[in-house]
Amino acid sequence: MIRHAALALLLAVFALLTARAEEAAPMKTYASFDAATISYHDVGTGPVVILLHGFSGNADLNWFQPGIAQKIAAAGYRVIAPDLRGHGASPFDAPPERWPADAIARDQIALTAHLGEAPYATAGYSMGAISALRFHLLSRNTGRLILGGIGDSVADENNTDRNTAFRAAIEDGLAGRDTPAAKAILARARATGGTLQGYLGALSARTYTPADLLATFNVPALILTGHEDLDNGSGPALAARIPGARYTRLTGTHLTAVIDPALPAAMIADLDSGR
């Protein structure tokens, strides 16, 4: 019960962040590996930087409303920011058993084929960062990794408390149960254009990356988490598992760290360091 109440509060806080809205770029589409239609923003010119948003959000909420995408584009990069499968303008309401394994990571492989250009960097926040890890693992893309809002629990397949809370909220919403968590996730879906069925599928298709595989990563990696963010484990501990990875501490919780000005500043500094 406490976990569900906390989830409702977190989702409500995230909804308040929409007050910082800035206009997002128009969206384009591509056909993914299984012909699903995925929508994405494309803004700026320069080396490609893919931005992957968090669970139950969309690219606009995560990257454009806080102004992060615009700042990266202004720094001389081509920002590609998809609405991930089952979210926002990329609806996918198949039942969980019909979601392909690693679907969101495989969508990014199809995206790079569509663009005809490998990314200079892939950056993700929360679920987007988990997907960025999987994208690198499956493709062995040589671009940089910027991973926000995740820690060492992404390597622990048994650490499912957070997923369980989200799943319970979604199932309450689908069943019409009037719980605080269900109300919060329904409000979130309405605000971002998502669906509960899409969210449920995304949770079901999520795959962890065990520590022995993290140890094989050989690209520059930056880990960023808020000083009060332990939602996905320890950021410094994750950095210690990836060879050569660096850690930057932000101010805030899992949700509020995305509006810390230090986030885009650290991302741009990392991007520039490789040019």
Regions found by a protein language model. Name each.
Residues 227-252:
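Conserved loop-alpha-helix segment in the C-terminal half of the alpha/beta-hydrolase fold
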Residues 118-155:
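Conserved hydrolase catalytic core segment
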